[in-house]
């Protein structure tokens, strides 16, 4: 839990820097610092989420990913309720030799990236939004339900 609090404090500070601190010469166009800080926030949050080894359903996702074989896609249920795109992406990752930990990292970057880009675009107070992302459980929800969190982030 301590690591999560430290991560929250660092990302809130980076979000504050994105809104208030100038890097280099003062420029009315603050887009560069916003992009830099946002990318750094995405890397930190996705790295923390993607490097986890256990959390809620992580073991189940890791196990199901490890069971994917070359013939898995042919026998997979392709109905909408069975999440065919999620299964196809996992199949492609496995067939391209992506490790189980990198599978988690891929989904962490996709989900966290979508979340942060969305909240940055609609936020009037970036540091408060990042703080609320943590305290409401939206960030840690991405640890528990990879399919559901990715669907929310992409939508």
Protein language model features and the residues they cover:
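Loop-to-helix entry region of an early transmembrane alpha helix in multi-pass inner-membrane enzymes
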Residues: 84, 96-113
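Extracytoplasmic loop-helix module adjacent to an early transmembrane segment
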Residues: 36, 49-72
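Start-transfer (signal-anchor) and selected internal transmembrane alpha helices
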Residues: 1-45
């Amino acid at each position: 839990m301590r690591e999560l609090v430290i991560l929250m404090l660092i990302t809130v500070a980076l979000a504050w820097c994105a809104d208030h601190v100038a890097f280099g010469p003062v420029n009315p166009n603050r887009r560069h610092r916003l992009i830099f800080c946002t990318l750094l926030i995405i890397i930190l949050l996705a790295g923390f989420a993607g490097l986890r080894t256990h959390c809620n359903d992580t073991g189940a996702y890791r196990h199901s990913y490890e069971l994917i074989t070359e013939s898995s896609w042919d026998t997979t249920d392709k109905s909408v309720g069975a999440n065919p795109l999620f299964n196809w992406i996992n199949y492609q990752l496995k067939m391209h030799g992506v490790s189980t930990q990198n599978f988690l990292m891929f989904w962490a970057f996709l989900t966290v990236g979508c979340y942060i880009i969305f909240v940055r675009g609609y936020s009037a107070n970036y540091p408060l939004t990042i703080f609320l992302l943590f305290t409401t459980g939206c960030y840690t929800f991405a640890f528990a339900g990879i399919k559901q969190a990715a669907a929310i982030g992409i939508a």
